């Protein structure tokens, strides 16, 4: 890619993020979402900046729910975003501005990451740009535009990109890079991190089949090295969650079933959708409106048809 292409991809990603969060881009220092989660996210950022100075060894003993311990792990700690915010908070940058920059930045970097992955897989700059916009503008993402952690999904496509590169040319450096991407996704959003690890485990047989026995032999050691890196980077972060689970308990089977996606979840769009809002409560519910968008589906089908046509020809 040329520098002009990279600049164009960056501009498109930022424009998409600004549209999704509109009108916050016009009032970065004074406007945040009216949803209570925006205030909660700003508190999380501020707590981390406070705790790393005042009580770094007790970071997860936040100033809520006293006398309970590990209360910062009662929700997603957004440790990566908080770490990025620390120097800005210390410099006196308004907290609302920091939150908005991280929110919009999470969407934009997600678009750029998907653009990079698809560009690597297809060698098509146009397809990459379309995929980046589609990933950034998912109806699910728009519905949760107030949730800081749910906008930070860039490390999902980056994990797949590093994994493809590892299978293509197995090296320890690429294995470590893959592990780092997984760890960063966990630190940015535990939800996505857990789902990413599960999907990686489920798709491993397909990669082994694709790679073949000889390539698998070469890939296995770097892959295990990457897995070890991911565990080492995330274990100190996940231990407080295990401790918190002993305090508040874990989700029972009924609750897991209630919030698990079904096939009809992928037909449900947010109620704010102009064309598909009627599907919001018919086939979905909160957290389970996963329709990817008609344009995305049609373009995906067109891409499959076009690829098949090229193969046949």
What are these regions (language model features)?
Residues 140, 147, 180-208, 230-238:
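Transmembrane helices and adjacent periplasmic/lumenal helix-loop junctions
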Residues 1-22, 221-228, 305-313:
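Start-transfer (signal-anchor) and selected internal transmembrane alpha helices
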Residues 153-168:
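Specific aromatic-rich, kink-prone transmembrane helix
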Residues 189, 225-255, 263, 269-277, ...:
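Membrane-lumen/periplasm interface segments of specific transmembrane helices
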Residues 16-111, 134-153, 257-284:
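Membrane-interface coil-to-helix junctions
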Residues 165-167, 196-229, 307-311:
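Perimembrane helix-loop-helix junctions
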Residues 114-137:
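Transmembrane-helix signature of polytopic, membrane-embedded enzymes
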Residues 168-183, 217-220:
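Short hydrophobic alpha-helices at membrane interfaces in multi-pass membrane enzymes
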